[in-house]
């Protein structure tokens, strides 16, 4: 973060603007809209500045910049066409610990002014840190079209309701749910937009009288294979509404950065063959937080119903009578194969695909004869530590030694690595990658050189 975003309360605060041209005019409008007591210093002023002074909206001081003008000021803006003067204003301001903005000089300024979308009291600010002001402007224009004008009225009503909500709902979680319901009311916003405050008040009163919102619930959310862009829209909504996030090690840092900032985060990561947190303890953690009336998200890498123990956790919730729902995710097989240029099925190479876990509760549960059959693609999850066994069993049951294979490490992320070779090399290649990795076995791997589009580190045996 190059710049710390902050909104300043400037109402009745003395501020200095140095510059009297059209650019300075735009800054003056913003400062006056914010309620600042504005002094403007310049050699010449546009007619608009002179009109503002006649109207008593600001004070004009003609002449060269005098550092004494900064005395008692909270904020300064240098908006002249003379860079020497602008830098003098900046230096004198910083010497007095006064924030100073130099217009159109992102690298030589004390603070920058973002593009804004004004739906007062709701304000949206967009900034590129001076690197791409046109991009910031384009984003502001998109937001202007997206955010209706009456949002400000909704925000005003919310401000008047704060004390009533605090008195009515005893916990932060309940208050948050009330606000989410309120802001989801399209009819309320429409009533305010139409000026029908009576109807709007009736809709608000109905929310206070609605069914209790203190029942806890758990949502099982698939976080996808790593790339945060592959998280579903519904999954994003759930993690941004949750009171508690219980997540494992396969959830990427990029996805976790999207979680609501004030949500409680509980890590229950597990490694193959070593359960950092026993499954029974994870189940109990879900139950405990849901029973406290919280909105809990169990966030799992990939899809929770594909080798994610999602079914086991939901059985525990169902037995306890806890409400739950499931948001599927893109499983690792789909994500890693797509980002590696390896289609899992292809009319010329594979008419079916099998998703197989490299770890089972008992040896021998897998039908290796079926797995070794031609015309299919095998995808092994959590198979690195069992690579030697996988290689041995497939060869024993008739799979050709030169069957192409690929190991995908950290699939779909910028850290993705793909190591390829043949079945006889699987045990050796497995030592060259780290978990989390996926093993893909089948003729479709030969398509990778032509179909790979995601550029990352790759290696061939």
Curated annotation (Swiss-Prot):
Q: Which reaction does it catalyse?
A: uroporphyrinogen III + 2 S-adenosyl-L-methionine = precorrin-2 + 2 S-adenosyl-L-homocysteine + H(+); precorrin-2 + NAD(+) = sirohydrochlorin + NADH + 2 H(+); siroheme + 2 H(+) = sirohydrochlorin + Fe(2+)
* Region feature (Uroporphyrinogen-III C-methyltransferase): 216-461
Listed as disulfide-bonded, the cysteine pairs are none
Q: What is its EC number?
A: 2.1.1.107, 1.3.1.76, 4.99.1.4
State the family named in the UniProt similarity comment for this chain: In the N-terminal section; belongs to the precorrin-2 dehydrogenase / sirohydrochlorin ferrochelatase family. In the C-terminal section; belongs to the precorrin methyltransferase family.
Q: Which InterPro entries match?
A: 4pyrrol_Mease, 4pyrrol_Methylase_sf, 4pyrrole_Mease_sub1, 4pyrrole_Mease_sub2, CobA/CysG_C, NAD(P)-bd_dom_sf, Siro_Cobalamin_biosynth, Sirohaem_synt_dimer_dom_sf
Q: Sorted alphabetically, which HAMAP family does this protein's record hold?
A: Siroheme_synth
Q: What Gene Ontology molecular-function terms does this entry list?
A: NAD binding; precorrin-2 dehydrogenase activity; sirohydrochlorin ferrochelatase activity; uroporphyrin-III C-methyltransferase activity
Q: What is the documented function of this protein? A: Then it catalyzes the NAD-dependent ring dehydrogenation of precorrin-2 to yield sirohydrochlorin. Finally, it catalyzes the ferrochelation of sirohydrochlorin to yield siroheme.
Active site per UniProt: 248 (proton acceptor), 270 (proton donor)
- Give the protein name, as stated in the record: Siroheme synthase
């Amino acid at each position: 973060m190059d710049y710390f975003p902050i909104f300043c309360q400037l109402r009745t605060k003395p501020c200095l603007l140095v510059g009297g041209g059209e650019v300075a005019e735009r800054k003056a409008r913003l400062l006056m809209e914010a309620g600042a007591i504005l002094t403007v210093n310049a050699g010449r002023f546009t007619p608009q500045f002179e009109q503002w002074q006649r109207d008593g909206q600001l004070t004009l001081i003609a002449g060269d910049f005098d550092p004494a003008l900064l005395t008692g000021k909270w904020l300064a803006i240098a908006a002249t066409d003379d860079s020497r003067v602008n830098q003098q204003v900046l230096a004198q301001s910083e010497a007095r610990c006064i924030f100073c903005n130099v217009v159109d000089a992102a690298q030589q300024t004390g603070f920058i002014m973002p593009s804004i979308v004004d739906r007062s009291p709701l304000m949206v600010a967009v900034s590129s840190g001076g690197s791409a002001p046109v991009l910031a402007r384009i984003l502001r224009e998109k937001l202007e079209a997206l955010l209706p004008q009456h949002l400000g009225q909704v925000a005003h009503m919310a401000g008047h309701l704060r004390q009533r909500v605090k008195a009515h709902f005893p916990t932060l979680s309940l208050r948050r749910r009330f606000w989410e319901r309120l802001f989801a009311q399209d009819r309320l916003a429409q009533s305010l937009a139409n000026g029908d405050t009576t109807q709007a008040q009736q809709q608000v009163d109905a929310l206070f009288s609605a069914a209790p919102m203190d029942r806890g619930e758990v949502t099982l959310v698939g976080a996808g294979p790593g790339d945060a862009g592959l998280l579903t829209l519904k999954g994003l909504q759930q993690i941004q509404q949750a009171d508690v996030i219980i997540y494992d090690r396969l959830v990427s840092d990029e996805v976790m950065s999207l979680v609501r900032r004030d949500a409680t985060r509980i890590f229950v990561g597990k490694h193959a063959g070593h359960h950092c947190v026993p499954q029974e303890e994870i189940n109990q953690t879900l139950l405990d937080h849901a029973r406290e009336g919280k909105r809990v998200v169990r966030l799992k890498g990939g899809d929770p119903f594909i080798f994610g123990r999602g079914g086991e956790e939901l059985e525990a919730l169902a037995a306890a009578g806890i409400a739950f729902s499931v948001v599927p995710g893109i499983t690792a097989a789909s994500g890693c194969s797509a980002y590696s240029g390896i289609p899992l099925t292809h009319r010329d190479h594979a008419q079916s695909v099998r998703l197989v876990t490299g770890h089972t509760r008992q040896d021998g549960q897998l039908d290796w004869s079926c797995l070794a059959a031609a015309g299919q693609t095998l995808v092994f999850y959590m198979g690195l530590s069992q690579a030697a066994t996988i290689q041995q069993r497939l060869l024993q049951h008739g799979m050709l030694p030169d069957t192409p294979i690929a190991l995908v490490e950290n699939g779909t992320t910028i850290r993705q690595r793909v190591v390829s070779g043949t079945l006889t090399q699987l045990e050796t290649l497995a030592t060259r990658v780290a978990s989390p990795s996926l093993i893909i076995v089948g003729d479709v791997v030969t398509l990778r050189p032509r179909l790979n589009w995601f550029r990352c580190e790759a290696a061939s045996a």
